[in-house]
Amino acid sequence: MKLKTFLIVGCLGGLFTLSSCTAPTNVKDYSVYVNPFIGTGGHGHTFPGAVVPHGMIQPSPDTRIDGWDACSGYYYADSTINGFSHTHVSGTGCCDYGDVLLMPTVGKQQYRTTDPQSQRLAYASSFSHKNEIAEPGYYSVFLDTYQVKAEISSTKRGAIHRYTFPENTESGFIIDLDYSLQRQTNSEMEIEVISDTEICGHKKTTYWAFDQYINFYAKFSKPFSYTLVTDSITMDNGKRLPVCKALLHFNTNKDEQVLVKVGVSAVDIAGARKNVESEIPGWDFEKVRKDARTAWNEYLSKIDITTSDKEDKAIFYTSLYHTGISPNLFTDADGRYLGMDLEVHQGDTLNPIYTVFSLWDTFRALHPLMTIIDPDLNNHFINSLIKKHQEGGIYPMWDLASNYTGTMIGYHAVPVIVDAYMKGYRNFDAKEAYKACLRAAEYDTTGIKCPDLVLPHLMPKAKYYKNAIGYIPCDRENESVAKALEYAYDDWCISIFAEAMSDFESKAKYERFAKAYEFYFDKSIRFMRGLDSKGEWRTPFNPRASTHRSDDYCEGTAWQWTWFVPHDVEGLVNLMGGEDAFVQKLDSLFSADSSLEGETTSSDISGLIGQYAHGNEPSHHVIHLYNYVNRPWRTQELVDSVYRSQYANSIDGLSGNEDCGQMSAWYILNSMGFYQVCPSKPVYSIGRPAFDKAVINLPEGKTFSIVVKNNGKKNKYIESVSLNGKALNIPFFNHQDIVNGGTMEIKMTDHPTKWGVLSPALSSKKEE
C-alpha cells in the first residue's frame, strides 16, 4: 500500500509547579577542568551531552544523521541541531542509537523532510557555538530558529530538560520516535498519549544492534494539546500504521520555562517510567544538575594532579571524564534487565548489569585503569560479562544493548577478567568465569543466541583453524594475522587462569597456543606475515599496504601488527634476532614513511608517527617495548612526543576514535608515568610522567602518589626513581605497589640517561 499520513488531535488539561534548587556544597570542583567538546571534531566521535558516570541515558544534541562522523550524533562543524535524543555511544567507529528525539518548536511545526537523504530534519534549528555550554552533567544551547534556550541534565536512568520559550501561541515540542542515527530500520514503533502531560512509547530497531528494544516515558510540566503522526512505515493490508511522531502544542509567555522528564528502558514502558520517577520525583532542574556535577566530582576526584599547565589539566580530566561514560548501566530501577537472550530477567540493583563493552579497545587500558581507580565497578563489569555468557552462550566481543554484534576480533573479555583476578580482585564466580573463557577460545557454533548474520563474526572459522592445525591460513580466513596474534595473547591469559584453577592440562594446551605467533614471523623481512594453507607466505607483500577489514590485518598494517606479542616480548625479541636487531626494527617503525598504499586504506590508521598509529589501538603498547630492551630513554621521549602531537584541548584533540574510553585511558595512565603493556600480567612499565604530582585516591583511604622533581617541557628524561624511599633501578613496578599505597618519586632531566638500563644478568628479571 502507498504511504499515508494519519492525524489524531486531542486536548487535555493539567499543570505542575516547580520547586527551588538546593544549596551548593563546598567540595573541590574537578568538573571545571573538563571540556566535553574535545573529540567532537576530527574523528574522535564523542558527544557533549549531559550524562552521569556510566549512566543508562545519554541525552545529547544531534547535528547530523548518518555517515562515519555521525557515530555520536554530534559533529562540531555542523551549524544545525535536529533535536535531543536520549541514547548515544561515545567515540566509536560503528554507529547506532539516537533514540527518542525531542525538539522544542515555535510557530507552525514542520515535520516532513523533502529530501530523505538530508542531514537536516524539517524541524531542525540553527545554532551558534558561542551560545553553547557543555560541562559534566549539563548541556545548554540557544536554538536560533525558535529563539528557545535548551538545557539538559540527567541522573543514571532519567533525563530532565528545561526550555525557555518566547511569547507565542504556537509553542510546542516534536517527539520523533521514527528518527534514529544512521536511519535505522524500525520493525516496531508506537507512541501513546497517557494524559495531557504524559507520553510513552516503544520501538524496535535493526542496525548494529540487530534487535534493539527501546521504551520511553516522558512527563511535561505544562499541559498540551497534541497531534499524532504516522508517515514513515508501509504496513501490510489490515494492519494499522504505527504512530511515529507526536506534535505537542501550547501557548507560552515571554521567558516561560517548560520542563520535560524522560526515562528509557530496554524492558518495557513501565520500567522507563519507574526509572525516571524514582530518580527525578519532582521538577527541580538545578538539583539534578547539581547532583550530576557531584557524581562527576566523585568520579574525577579518584586522581588528583598538580600542574601549572591548564591545557594539560583540561586534557587529563576530560580524558578521565571520557572513561566514565561507558560501559552503561542496563538494569532498571526495579532490578529488571534485558539479557543477551533478549528475555527479561529479574536482577539486583546492587549488582547491576552493564552494556556497551568495546572490548577490543578497552581491554588494553580502560579496564586496567578501572582496577586501579574503581576495582569494585570493574567487578560489576566482569559479573555482567559472566551473565552475558550464561544467557547468550558465550562472552560478547562487542556488546550493545544486550546484542551480540560480532564486531572486531579476539575474545577480549578473557584478559579483562584474568587481569582483575591476577590483581586480586575476585568478587565474581571464578570457576564460571574460567569455564566461559575456555568456551570463548574454542570453535563451537552451538548454543549461541545471536542472529545468523552475526554468528560467523562471533564464532569465526579462525578458531577452528587455530585449534585444528595450529595456525590460521590467510587464504581461508580474513584478517588471519591479526586474529592469530590476538588469539595467542588471549590464550596466554587462559593459560595462567588455568594454572590458578589447577587445570594443568589446559594450562599446557593454552601455553602452546600462546606461542602460535611464531608461525607468522617471516625472519627474512622481520614482519608478521600471512601464511596460506600450503604453508607459503602471502605474496606480494607490502608492510604499508592496507585494505580496510579485507586483508591479513585488522585496521592496520604489518608495521603496526608485528609488535602485538605483549605476553612474550622476550620471545619476540629473540625472533627479531636479539636486542640490537629488535631496537633497529622498532626505531624503523617510528621513522618509516607514514603513507599507506591501497585503494581502500583503513581510516582507522591515524595519528601516525612513522608507521606507529596512535589513533588506533594495536599500537598502544608499542612505545613501552623499549623498556624491555634497555632503551628506556626512547620510551620516555616517544611518550612525550605522543602527548604533544596526539592530544590537545580542542575539538579535534584526539587523533582517532576515542573508543569508549580507551584513547583517554592511555593518556591517563601514561601521563601519571606508567602503562600496563600486558593486561593479566600485573606489572607497569614506567614512561614519562606529565605532571608535577599525581595522587591516586585508592579504596579504604589509601593513596599512591607519583611526585615528579625537576619536571618541565624539556626535561622529558628520567634521572632516577625511588619507591617509598628505596631506589628503583628497573623501569617496571607491580600493581601491588599501588594497592599498598605509598610514594614514587621520579627525578627528571633534559638528556637521556642510563636509568633503567640493566646488566645482562638482570635483564631476564626486568619484570619481576
Ranges and model annotations:
Residues 18-20:
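C-terminal motif of bacterial Sec signal peptides marking the signal peptidase cleavage site
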Residues 5-14:
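Sec-dependent N-terminal signal peptides
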Residues 490:
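ATP-dependent phospho-/nucleotidyl transfer catalytic cores
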Residues 717:
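Extracellular attachment/recognition segments
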Residues 1-2:
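N-terminal secretory signal peptides that target proteins for export/translocation
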Residues 23-367, 371-415, 421-485, 493-519, ...:
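Accessory carbohydrate-recognition regions in carbohydrate-active enzymes
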